Amino acid sequence: MHRYRTHTCGALRDSHIDQTVRLSGWCHRIRDHGGVLFIDLRDHYGLTQCVADPDSPAFKDAEKLRAEWVVRIDGKVRRRPEGTDNPDLPTGAVEVFVTEIEVLGPAGELPLPVFGEQEYPEDVRLRYRFLDLRREKLHQNIMTRGAIVDSMRRRMKEQGFFEFQTPILTASSPEGARDFLVPSRIHPGKFYALPQAPQQYKQLLMMSGFDRYFQIAPCFRDEDPRADRLPGEFYQLDVEMSFVTQDDIFAAMEPVITGVFEEFAKGKRVTKGWPRIAFADSMRKYGTDKPDLRNPIEMQDVSEHFRGSGFKVFARMLEEQRNQVWAIPGPGGGSRAFCDRMNSWAQGEGQPGLGYIMWREGGEGAGPLANNIGPERTEAIRTALGLKAGDAAFFVAGDPSKFVKFAGLARTKVGEELNLIDKDQFALAWVVDFPMYEYNEDDKKVDFSHNPFSMPQGGMEALTSQDPLTIKAFQYDITCNGYEIASGGIRNHRPEAMVKAFEIAGYGEQEVVDRFGGMYRAFQYGAPPHGGMAAGVDRIVMLLCGTTNLREISLFPMNQRAEDLLMGAPSEVSPKQLRELHIRLNLPDTK
């Protein structure tokens, strides 16, 4: 017999009855029913009920056991008594009558229980992550994550992609966020950077004559805490292809992502034949570049119905050409209570309020806006929005560039409050035609909107003749249920176009050479047209596991202060280590 087990805790069935077995695992739960001890023994594979009564030679040892002790149990498999089967367990028809117990690892008093799924403070869960990971839901999420990554790999290889590994120590580059820097001992005063993404390396692979690259790549960004991103590191399905158009990339990747979602959707519908939505249309209809298409609400520009109207607040705004009035339809929301609730919500979001019109059963409009603009305009708005009696519409006005984010939040809020969002669906879409540049209000200059290596639509001619803020890029995102889950683009593979693109964003040619020297040199020796994308592994897993917290699908995450409470990172290092790296600390004054 094996030293520790003949079977796992998830293996025993009716066919094993009367067999002598050996199991090892953790004491998940111990119950005393009238002097009979029931030990639920758990391992990675499942749970088995073990029974010790006073006649068992191991009863005295069983009485000493406590939760989460690691034990070896020998015993005989028997049928559970009639009426005590547990249909929720694969092993629920049998139990093990205990004949011998060996304690392999006793456990101290638990700072959080493993049995049950009680909510515990995050700092406790992260400090004792090894206990937290024993809990069923989190443990299963981590296993699902591994299966999803396996599925991604398999599907990428079926599409003809080959997996590569790119360096972790690289050069610092301006890709949007701060780099994590690693000091060089051999080169005093110089630093490596952990890659924010394998962007340059994967493009260099295309210039090296390879094709169809992919990698499950760790990425590192020293960013301030955000609700939708873990501090420190994240993983992406990184992809690059040579001699391709945007449509070629869509054709290769849409089946991969669709297939992964279908495999793990647990019965939810998955979009087939993804819609392609232009960035400008997405912002106008949904108020965001990552629309949740489960929500059927589409916003409309209804400025013409308020221009010159009796509602002077909007009418005066519309005298300025840049201002508009957008409507957010609210099907079924035509009650004063709901409209007042939305108005209060808007005020809580820092807005002066949220104008509304509701249509009563007779079809007439009601509310302050309807009273001011009159029945003819009110009816025209209802017709334009396709609304009926019992519906409502909410309105935002001003400069769209300033109110669009709030309008998107309002659309989501209306959809949630009116139960319009289809929770049994993964709604996937491409968002295309992103602007190449945007105006940076902080630095008062034109800057890259997204990836600086993207090809501008119109190429060199667009860079030299168009207003930069009107140039679109061959750049695209994949969105799902309100999350951006992938981003990519066709690359700017001509060196003169690359230099010009960076020049518009305020980078001189020498700075481009200094920062991207390897790739810039490679461009001089025959660079193929190429493009790719990167899909966020963490966000995809989060969606498929049905959680909204990335920590629920990550093994050892940091907290929102970028601290690893289990390992004690970041930590101080010894003076000797600092001297070897030629580093002298200049700490901020904490007084």
Swiss-Prot record:
Residues 199-202 are annotated as: Aspartate. Pfam families: GAD, tRNA-synt_2, tRNA_anti-codon. Its main location: cytoplasm. One of its GO terms (biological process) is aspartyl-tRNA aminoacylation. One of its GO terms (cellular component) is cytoplasm. The record marks 33, 83 as: Important for tRNA non-discrimination. It comes from the Bacteria. Keywords: Aminoacyl-tRNA synthetase, ATP-binding, Cytoplasm, Ligase, Nucleotide-binding, Protein biosynthesis. It is an enzyme of class 6 (ligase). L-aspartate binds at residues 175, 221, 450, 491. Homodimer. HAMAP family: Asp_tRNA_synth_type1. Belongs to the class-II aminoacyl-tRNA synthetase family. Type 1 subfamily. This is Aspartate--tRNA(Asp/Asn) ligase. It comes from Rhodopseudomonas palustris (strain TIE-1).
